[in-house]
Amino acid sequence: GERLDRLHGKRLLPLRRQFQAVFQDPYGSLNPRLSVEQIVGEGLRIHGIGDAGERRARVLEALREVGLDEPCLERYPHEFSGGQRQRIAIARALVLKPALILLDEPTSALDRSVQCQVVELLRRLQRRHGLSYLFISHDLAVVRALAHDILVLKDGRVVEQGSAAALFSQPRHPYTRELLGTMPALRLEEHLRVAGLGI
């Protein structure tokens, strides 16, 4: 491996294509002055991928993968709901065909029913494209629904690490047990089943 914190400028640019991010606030992370086509296609332009027609086609493909259609291309972020904005942010990450997507609290600003839809979308995209996710969240129900392996951090230090199944069934560290004790009784998996989205 290579230390990413030691890379700068031109040495870092090729790696940025492989590593994309989706942030917590789907409105704050989208430039309100740009159309959806410009927002999702910005990475393609920066990396010099394709001509205008090819970029538009790839943007439309990414939007369709997240459940949005062609008329969305010319619209602006304020014209969409929070869940739709997060889909736009996911399309922006997806359009470069990265190996890894950082998901920084991507569902925390959404209500539970929309969270379920976004979680199911992320699962489907992961299966389809073989994506790796680095998922940061305080919502343990969403963590349980998405994660395969988990790191538990306290005050910036890792206190426990393991598979999701092991950590949720047999937590070892007191802080992990404390966190699990705060989980709401109704699991996200139950919401997914009720919504007919699977688990």
Specify the residue positions occupied by each region the protein language model found:
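Conserved ABC ATPase "signature" region
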Residues: R3, E54-P71, L180-G181
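ABC ATPase NBD coupling module
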Residues: R3-Q20, I46, A166-P171
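Conserved ABC ATPase signature
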Residues: Y76-F80, Q84
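A short, proline-enriched helix->beta-strand linker immediately N-terminal to the Walker B motif
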Residues: V95-A99
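A short, surface-exposed alpha-helical micro-motif characterized by mixed small hydrophobic
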Residues: V143-A145
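ABC ATPase "signature
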Residues: Q161-G162
